[in-house]
């Protein structure tokens, strides 16, 4: 049978990334409290494609994933990419793994327990003379506007916010530690389950601890700077403004 992908392309244009997106795949991640956690991940995989090849072989990405079924994690990440490079005869390979991670949280007053989900990601690339790997997590928090509190006789506008942290690191660390750092760097935390006594507590706590979006990214960055295990980080915060039809945003990264 003729292999169309291997035919020569005459347009002389290299493709930096070509591959498959949105592969739903079960993986196992380490859980600080329970040991391991089984999650359903969405995986993107790419390779470079030299200008003289018409196309890549999409099925080979899935074949490699199947070889590592049950063993897709931080430790095997670059092994998988090296296998992809070899199987597709590519100079570079890239992979992005996004998954929901669940932590049991306890309501601050009633003690009610519930599961809270956080979107986490592993991403990186592997080439002959270069490797890169990042861990990312999106943490929901709340913010109360300091300006609104200052000028209002009663109350202040508040909103849910997403803080996204991405890090490069030397040694293993727990996702829970980054999540906790972020949650305690904003006006307040987000919970899946709150009783009335808890709602009162988190409302008053947020009001007593107002922050701009700028304060949140600086607070998180200041505490990440204290962690010598991290070689690089980025922090972005987005407030879903309750009194505007737009969002507030701030970004900082380690220089």
UniProtKB/Swiss-Prot annotation:
GO process annotations (BP): tetrahydrofolate biosynthetic process
Q: Which UniProt keywords apply?
A: Hydrolase
Catalyzed chemical reaction(s): GTP + H2O = 7,8-dihydroneopterin 3'-triphosphate + formate + H(+)
| Superkingdom, taxonomy of origin | Bacteria
InterPro entries reported in the protein's UniProt record: GTP_cyclohydrolase_FolE2, GTP_cyclohydrolase_FolE2/MptA
Q: Where is this site: May be catalytically important?
A: 145
Give the molecular function GO annotations: GTP cyclohydrolase I activity
- Keyword Hydrolase present in the record's keywords: the answer is yes
Keyword Hydrolase among record annotations: yes
EC number annotated for this UniProt entry: 3.5.4.16
Q: Which HAMAP family match?
A: GTP_cyclohydrol_B (MF_01527_B)
Stated family: Belongs to the GTP cyclohydrolase IV family.
Q: What does this protein do?
A: Converts GTP to 7,8-dihydroneopterin triphosphate.
Tell me what this protein is called: GTP cyclohydrolase FolE2
Q: Which organism encodes this protein?
A: Syntrophus aciditrophicus (strain SB)
The top of its lineage is: Bacteria, Pseudomonadati, Thermodesulfobacteriota, Syntrophia, Syntrophales
UniProt gene name: folE2
């Amino acid at each position: 049978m003729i292999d169309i992908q291997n035919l020569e392309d005459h347009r002389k244009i290299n493709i930096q990334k070509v591959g498959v997106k949105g592969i739903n795949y079960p993986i196992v991640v380490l859980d600080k409290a329970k040991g391991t956690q089984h999650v359903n991940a969405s995986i993107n995989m790419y390779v470079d494609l030299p200008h003289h090849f018409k196309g890549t072989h999409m099925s080979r990405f899935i074949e490699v994933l199947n070889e590592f079924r049950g063993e897709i994690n931080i430790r095997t990440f670059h092994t998988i990419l090296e296998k992809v490079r070899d199987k597709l005869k590519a100079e570079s390979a890239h992979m992005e793994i996004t998954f929901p991670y669940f932590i049991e949280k306890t309501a601050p007053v009633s003690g009610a327990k519930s599961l809270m989900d956080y979107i986490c990601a592993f991403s990186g690339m592997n080439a002959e003379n270069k490797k890169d790997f990042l861990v990312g997590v999106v943490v929901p928090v709340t913010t109360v506007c300091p300006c609104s509190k200052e000028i209002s006789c009663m109350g202040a506008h508040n909103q849910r916010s997403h803080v996204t942290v991405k890090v490069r690191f030397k040694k293993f660390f727990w996702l829970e530690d980054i999540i906790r750092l972020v949650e305690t760097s904003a006006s307040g935390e987000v919970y899946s389950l709150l009783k009335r006594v808890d709602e009162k507590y988190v409302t008053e706590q947020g009001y007593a601890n107002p922050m701009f979006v700028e304060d949140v990214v600086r607070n998180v960055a200041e505490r990440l700077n204290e962690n010598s295990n991290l070689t690089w980080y980025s922090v972005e915060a987005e407030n879903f403004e309750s009194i505007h039809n737009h969002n507030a945003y701030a970004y900082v990264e380690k220089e």
